[in-house]
């Protein structure tokens, strides 16, 4: 595989912000997994321990603390173990049994009735996570997480049926549609406000700009994983859908060209993420919106940092990949054009300017601020701390915002010290 340095330059204008207690988070989640009996094979348990899954959760939420962070980390550890034991090794048969198992697994989490999957450690472990999360979420937040989990399982059924039929995803749009959901990203994104101690109002989460940012985050992380994990998957014989394979088949490219095109594709999506985020984070935006969009950006950077150092992904790409806070020039020549995609092209067609939340007179939780004001730190429920009565719940020690001096295009996302 012949690759130039520029072919492996990942555009990511987000600062690295490690968690000061990351090793403790990782130790606790590994102890939890061991106590739950996942993975079930000693060899897989050794691999899970070596990859240090808790470091990813700690990077995603570098200011989170306490039991809610542990529950968040355990959820990601569960996803890693479940993916390796149930998804990567599927032989493509038993689609009916697979769908039934996932339906029962979701019902165990939804109702707590473990008898639906008696003795299954993954069902019991996920039920444990759900019970702990319910302590920190509102009913709406928990329902949103359960719905994201249902969507993830539905995508896994489609993926298994594709394997059974030896369907190689004939188009890039087929791939994009599958990868928006089969990476379980939405199950994590729905918990970003919970783990950081605030509530993003549902009416803000459903605005076009925020919906687009959520989808971009989910796809960016999945695409980055495809690029960085391709060597592992190609040598282990997995039949997972991978962007490099799709580009190779649809564009008749060499492996090196497929990597270059994949990186160019993700860089274009990253550029659009920055553009939309800059439009969403207006002076009138509530602090919860600032924190949520920053959380999305942190997810993208955390995944890159984790993937480039974990034992889970090793190979020629991870050894040579680099991150750049500056825009990477688009790939010259032919390649995928995401803005023309029927699946994700709408990200480039969001009306501009975006309507201000609450501008139509609706009763929305928007507090107008003067341009240049810092977004106040908000507690659970969305109100600034100085408006709350009683002791506030643990929150970030400071707001996290983009640099307001030069805009997101020219600057990185960084903590705003007070």
From Swiss-Prot:
It catalyses: (2E,6E)-farnesyl diphosphate + H2O = (+)-T-muurolol + diphosphate. Substrate binds at residues 179, 232, 312-313. Residues 402-412 have a biased composition (Polar residues). One of its GO terms (biological process) is terpenoid biosynthetic process. InterPro entries: Isoprenoid_synthase_dom_sf, Terpene_cyclase-like_2. Mg(2+) 1 binds at residues 83, 88. One of its GO terms (molecular function) is terpene synthase activity. Catalyzes the conversion of (2E,6E)-farnesyl diphosphate (FPP) into (+)-T-muurolol via a 1,10-cyclization, which requires isomerization of FPP to nerolidyl diphosphate (NPP) and then abstraction of the pyrophosphate from intermediate NPP leading to a (E,Z)-germacradienyl (helminthogermacradienyl) cation. Belongs to the terpene synthase family. This is (+)-T-muurolol synthase ((2E,6E)-farnesyl diphosphate cyclizing). Pathway: Secondary metabolite biosynthesis; terpenoid biosynthesis. It holds the Pfam family Terpene_syn_C_2. Its cofactor is Mg(2+). The Asp-Asp-Xaa-Xaa-Xaa-Asp (DDXXXD) motif is important for the catalytic activity, presumably through binding to Mg(2+). Mg(2+) 3 binds at residues 225, 229, 233. The record marks 80 as: Plays a critical role in the stabilization of intermediate cation. Mg(2+) 2 binds at residue 88. The record marks 84, 159 as: Plays a critical role for substrate recognition. Residues 354-418 are annotated as: Disordered. Binds 3 Mg(2+) ions per subunit. Its EC number is 4.2.3.98. The record marks 183 as: Plays a critical role for abstraction of the pyrophosphate group. Keywords: Lyase, Magnesium, Metal-binding, Plasmid. A motif (DDXXXD motif) lies at residues 83-88.
């Amino acid at each position: 595989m012949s690759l130039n340095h520029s072919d492996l330059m990942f555009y990511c204008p987000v600062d690295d912000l490690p968690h000061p207690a990351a090793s403790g988070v990782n130790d606790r989640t590994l102890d939890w997994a061991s106590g739950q009996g996942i993975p079930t094979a000693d060899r897989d348990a050794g691999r899970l321990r070596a990859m240090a899954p808790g470091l990813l959760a700690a990077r995603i939420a570098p200011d989170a603390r306490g039991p809610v962070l542990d529950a968040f980390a355990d959820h990601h550890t569960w996803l890693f173990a479940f993916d390796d034991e149930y998804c990567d090794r599927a032989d493509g048969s038993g689609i009916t049994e697979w769908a039934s198992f996932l339906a029962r697994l979701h019902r165990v989490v939804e109702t707590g009735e473990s008898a639906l999957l008696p003795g299954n450690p993954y069902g019991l472990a996920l039920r444990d996570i759900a019970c702990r999360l319910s302590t920190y979420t509102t009913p709406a937040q928990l329902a949103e997480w359960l719905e994201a989990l249902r969507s993830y399982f539905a995508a896994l059924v489609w993926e298994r049926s594709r394997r059974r039929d030896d369907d190689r995803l004939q188009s890039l749009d087929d791939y994009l549609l599958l990868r928006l959901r089969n990476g379980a990203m939405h199950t994590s994104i729905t918990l970003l406000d919970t783990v950081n101690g605030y509530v993003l109002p549902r009416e803000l989460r459903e605005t076009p700009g925020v919906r687009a940012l959520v989808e971009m985050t989910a796809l960016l992380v999945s695409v980055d994983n495809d690029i960085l994990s391709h060597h592992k998957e190609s040598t282990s014989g997995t039949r997972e859908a991978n962007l490099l394979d799709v580009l190779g088949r649809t564009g008749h490219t060499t492996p090196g060209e497929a990597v270059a095109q994949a990186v160019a594709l993700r860089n274009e999506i990253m550029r659009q993420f920055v553009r939309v985020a800059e439009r969403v984070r207006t002076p009138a935006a509530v602090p919860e919106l600032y924190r949520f969009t920053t959380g999305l950006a942190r997810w993208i950077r955390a995944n890159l940092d984790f993937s480039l150092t974990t034992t889970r992904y090793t190979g020629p790409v991870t050894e040579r990949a680099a991150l750049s806070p500056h825009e990477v020039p688009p790939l010259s020549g032919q390649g995928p054009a995401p803005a023309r995609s029927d699946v994700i092209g709408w990200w480039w067609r969001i009306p501009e300017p975006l309507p201000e939340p609450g501008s139509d007179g609706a009763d929305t939780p928007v507090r107008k601020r003067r341009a240049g004001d810092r977004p106040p730190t908000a507690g659970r429920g969305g109100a600034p701390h100085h408006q709350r009565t009683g002791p506030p719940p643990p929150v970030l020690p400071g707001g996290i915002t983009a640099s307001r001096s030069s805009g997101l295009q020219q600057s990185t996302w960084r903590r705003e010290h007070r």
